[in-house]
Amino acid sequence: MSAQRLRIAIQKKGRLSKECQELFKRCGMKFNISGERLVVHSENMPIDLLLVRDDDIPSLIMDGVVDLGVIGENELEEVRLERKALGEPSAFTTLRRLDFGGCRLSIAIDKDAVYNGPQDLAGKRIATTYSQLLKSFMDEKNIPFSTCILNGSVEVAPRAGLSDAIADLVSTGATLEANGLKEAEVIFRSKATLIQREGEFDADKAALIDKLLTRMQGCIQAKESKYIMLHAPTDKLEAIKSLLPGAEDPTVLPLSSDGAKVAVHLVSTENLFWETMEQLKALGASSILVLPIEKMME
């Protein structure tokens, strides 16, 4: 692995792995991940991907071993707090929050328990993988508690008699419900984020990072946007434009065969819901198309 190539650490397996790989491919990076390889070389860019455990990524960044990393904010903050407590380097730069990996770290209790607030957790034993985030939350509330640290299957701890409650990642809440638990407190909200090590970069690496960030912005914006095309009566054009959630003013073009109508094109940064389409139709709009956008650049 050459020091001249940009080194990016990503999760080898898990909830962020697939979407992270897809994002880099949408940014134009060509690579082939197969087998148990730990380092993957991009075929068309001077970039190496390191496939590692998610909890190793923050330390690789903070120790300056890799240049960039994609990591869940929950894992990043857990490691930062742990290293800070140990007096180890914990600096990094956040380049941008990404549009996937959303979850929350929550305290969950028995589904039949009455819960009046954080004070009800006083003196309780709480099972978690995220002991630092839990401690930070409970200390801020000045609530005494004890921790049962587990590295998996946290949700079964109360039934096994290991704890009174748990603090674990929640996406939909289905796992909690299946284990007879309910959310009581949200400790931390998280998404995937792109981070960078501290220190200087040479001109080539800095330019490559800027290029990746620009492409990521385009990919994320395209994913959140739609291209809308329709035909509109000229006498209802202003009313129709007021219904369209466009990023900029729409493009209005004459139709060759119908002087009473124009073609309206625009990029929408919001979803065009069925109700809006029905309102457009009621105003006389026709040939309404809502299309996905693969890439865009402002």
Curated annotation (Swiss-Prot):
PANTHER family: ATP PHOSPHORIBOSYLTRANSFERASE (PTHR21403:SF8), ATP PHOSPHORIBOSYLTRANSFERASE ATP-PRTASE (PTHR21403). Its EC number is 2.4.2.17. Catalyzes the condensation of ATP and 5-phosphoribose 1-diphosphate to form N'-(5'-phosphoribosyl)-ATP (PR-ATP). Has a crucial role in the pathway because the rate of histidine biosynthesis seems to be controlled primarily by regulation of HisG enzymatic activity. Its cofactor is Mg(2+). One of its GO terms (cellular component) is cytoplasm. This is ATP phosphoribosyltransferase. Feedback inhibited by histidine. It is found in: Cytoplasm. Pathway: Amino-acid biosynthesis; L-histidine biosynthesis; L-histidine from 5-phospho-alpha-D-ribose 1-diphosphate: step 1/9. GO terms for molecular function: ATP binding; ATP phosphoribosyltransferase activity; magnesium ion binding. The keyword Magnesium applies. GO terms for biological process: L-histidine biosynthetic process. The keyword Transcription regulation does not apply. Pfam families: HisG, HisG_C. Belongs to the ATP phosphoribosyltransferase family. Long subfamily. Keywords: Amino-acid biosynthesis, ATP-binding, Cytoplasm, Glycosyltransferase, Histidine biosynthesis, Magnesium, Metal-binding, Nucleotide-binding, Transferase. InterPro entries: ATP-PRT_HisG_long (IPR020621), ATP_PRibTrfase_cat (IPR013820), ATP_PRibTrfase_CS (IPR018198), ATP_PRibTrfase_HisG (IPR001348), HisG_C (IPR013115), N-reg_PII-like_a/b (IPR011322), N-reg_PII/ATP_PRibTrfase_C (IPR015867). It catalyses: 1-(5-phospho-beta-D-ribosyl)-ATP + diphosphate = 5-phospho-alpha-D-ribose 1-diphosphate + ATP. It comes from the Bacteria. HAMAP family: HisG_Long.
